[in-house]
């Protein structure tokens, strides 16, 4: 049983719905007509996407230079009576890595501002054992305090925070970032390693009350494979390479005969959960392990998960609903194809990137700079979440990583 808990907070949304806080109104693009057309100019498009992230990062900062960008804005998440501002650490990690990909001085400054916030919430967690939580309130950070909005500690989230901190250490040489990454990794190893129930790997994390999530997720183990491999390179400690191999072997065990990769296990930690089949398990298995065997998963994706919604074409989030495009997935599918470099892959990747640029310009609730999460409101993930056509930092960051050809699961070689 695998959940997409790093991307959204369905429990928060359900509570808000029950309280009558969500309205059906949508907010139109505030300044789209004033933004230059970047659909035919990839460099301009990238520059505008970074401008979107810059504005989000600078919106919520404290007096010590720590900043935390809200994850979603506009449309479903912004109505006349309610504004959803939580910041998901998965999105924050992607933004950090996207900034290091371009690497301008202001990019590194903003990446450090987010990274310092991640260290701040880690150091000030109520339990204080190296964990971070799913999401935090940026208004709290602005006031110099930690306000947890998503209290779960999910393994995939931890690995993404770790990869962001590892990337910051690689970019800046500041030891505090590597120390924070190692703390995260030790939490993962201590609390989620499963070497009893084959296939061995890492379980889903913990709920707020300390209840362990005993299923194992392909996506989470892919995250760990990438993160622990980075730690092995940065620390020189081969134990992290050994642990990365455990996670990678779990992912291998989830690959079906037709090439696709299943989502993980049921509660027994061994029985394969075959529904739904998510896009992440296909693309991230390739990016996170670097294993050519998952090229078959990319081919399966192209055959089974591509959606067309009006002028937009690209992957959906899973096989549950292939009527809408998930632009975050367009980003990591484009990056996977670009890095694989097989016959026709470059053209396919560019087509996906062109679709994102079109959404950047024309999508409902867009601003001409950032990228919305989906082509239409209400995309069903199959895991109990709905996704909406609202501006999203994580989607925008994946676009920038794909445009740069920068794999967040691996450290840069330059």
State where each predicted segment sits.
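Alpha-helical support elements that line or immediately flank enzyme active sites
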Residues: 96-105, 111, 282-283, 337, ...
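Extended ligand-binding clefts on enzyme/binding-domain cores
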Residues: 37-77, 86-90, 120-146, 152-156, ...
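Aromatic-anchored glycine-rich loop motif in surface-exposed flexible loops
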Residues: 149, 170-171
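C-terminal region of N-terminal signal peptides and the immediate post-cleavage residues
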Residues: 21-40
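N-terminal export and membrane-targeting signals
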Residues: 2-16
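Tandem alpha-helical RNA-recognition repeat domains
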Residues: 100, 166, 170, 229-233
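Non-membrane alpha-helical segments in proteins
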Residues: 84, 91-101, 113-117, 160-164
């Amino acid at each position: 049983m695998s959940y997409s808990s790093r991307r959204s907070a369905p429990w928060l949304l359900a509570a808000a719905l029950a309280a009558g806080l969500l309205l059906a109104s949508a907010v139109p693009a505030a300044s789209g007509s004033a933004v230059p057309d970047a659909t035919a100019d990839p460099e301009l498009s990238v520059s505008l996407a970074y401008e979107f992230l810059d504005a989000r990062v600078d919106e919520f900062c404290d007096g010590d230079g720590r900043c935390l960008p809200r994850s979603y804005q506009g449309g479903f998440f912004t109505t006349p009576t309610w504004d959803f501002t939580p910041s998901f650490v998965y999105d924050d990690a992607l933004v950090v890595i996207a900034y290091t990909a371009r690497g301008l001085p202001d990019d590194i400054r903003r990446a450090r501002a987010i990274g310092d916030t991640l260290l701040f919430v880690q150091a000030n967690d109520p339990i204080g054992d190296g964990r971070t939580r799913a999401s935090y309130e940026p208004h709290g950070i602005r006031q110099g305090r930690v306000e947890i909005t998503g209290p779960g500690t999910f393994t995939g989230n931890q690995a993404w925070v770790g990869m962001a901190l590892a990337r910051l250490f690689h970019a800046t040489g500041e030891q505090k970032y590597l120390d924070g990454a190692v703390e995260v990794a030790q939490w993962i190893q201590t609390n989620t390693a499963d070497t009893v129930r084959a296939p061995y790997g890492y379980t889903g994390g913990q709920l707020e009350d300390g209840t362990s999530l005993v299923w194992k997720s392909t996506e989470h183990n892919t995250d760990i494979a990438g993160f622990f491999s980075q730690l092995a390179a940065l620390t020189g400690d081969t134990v992290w390479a050994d642990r990365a191999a455990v996670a990678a072997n779990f992912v291998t065990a989830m690959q079906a005969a037709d090439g696709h990769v299943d989502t993980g296990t049921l509660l027994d930690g061994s029985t394969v959960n075959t529904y739904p089949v998510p896009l992440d398990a296909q693309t991230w298995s390739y990016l996170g392990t670097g294993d050519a065997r998952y090229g078959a998963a990319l081919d399966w994706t192209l055959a089974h998960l591509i959606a067309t919604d009006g002028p937009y074409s690209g992957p959906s989030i899973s096989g549950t609903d292939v009527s809408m495009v998930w632009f975050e997935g367009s980003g990591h599918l484009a990056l996977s194809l670009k890095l694989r470099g097989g016959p026709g892959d470059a053209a396919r990747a560019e087509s996906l990137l062109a679709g994102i640029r079109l959404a950047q310009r024309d999508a409902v609730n867009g601003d001409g700079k950032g990228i919305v999460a989906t082509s239409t409101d209400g995309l069903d993930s199959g895991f109990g979440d709905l996704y909406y056509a609202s501006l999203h930092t994580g989607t925008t960051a994946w676009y920038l990583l794909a445009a740069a050809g920068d794999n967040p699961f691996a450290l840069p070689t330059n």
